[in-house]
C-alpha cells in the first residue's frame, strides 16, 4: 500500500450538538478561504439542462445558509446514519451567491459507547490509505437521546475527488478513528454511505456542467 494523501481539518461553521438534536440541516459549511487552491467552477455555457441538474440534486438535501450566503448540499443518508448513532464519512457541496465556485468538503463522524477525542482518521481500501489529521479542539460530547458519545471533523477537499471515486470502486472501505489517548474504532462504510458519496459526486459533476443562472434557479426551488 502507498500513502496517497494527508489532509488537515478545514474551517467550518458547525455545532455538532445542533446537528444531532435538529438534523443535518442545522449544519453549515464555510466557503474555502481566498488564499486556498481554487475549487472547480460552474460552466459558462449551458451544457447541462435544468431537468438534468434537478434530477441530480433530487436525491440530496439543499438548504440555504443566510449567514454564509450560499447553498449547502448534503445527503439525507447522513442524517439517517446519525439518528442510528452510526459512524460515517460524508461529503458536502457548497455554492455561494456571488461566486461560481463549487466547494466540496468531507465530514467524518464518530459514534461509540466511549468518549473518543479524534486525533486522526485513516480511510483505507485494498490498495491505498488516506490519513486525515484532526484539529486539537474537541467538538464532540455525549448525546442523551442517542445514548452515545460522538465527535465530528470536517475537511476541505480542495477539488480532490479522484480518491472518492477510488473508494466507490473498492471492494471494501474502512475508516479508523484514532483518539488522542490512542484508542481506536474502525468503521466499514455501509452501502448507504457509499451511495451518499456517489450521489454527491454525481451532483458535483452535473453542477460543473451547468451555467450559473440555471444552477441558482434549481437550487432556490429545492431549498428545504
Tell where the protein language model's regions lie, with residue ranges:
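Helix-centric, low-specificity signal for extended rod-like, repetitive segments
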Residues: 1-2, 47
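Bacterial N-terminal signal peptides that target proteins for export
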Residues: 3-14
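A generic "folded-domain core" signal
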Residues: 13, 27-224
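Hydrophobic core
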Residues: 15-22
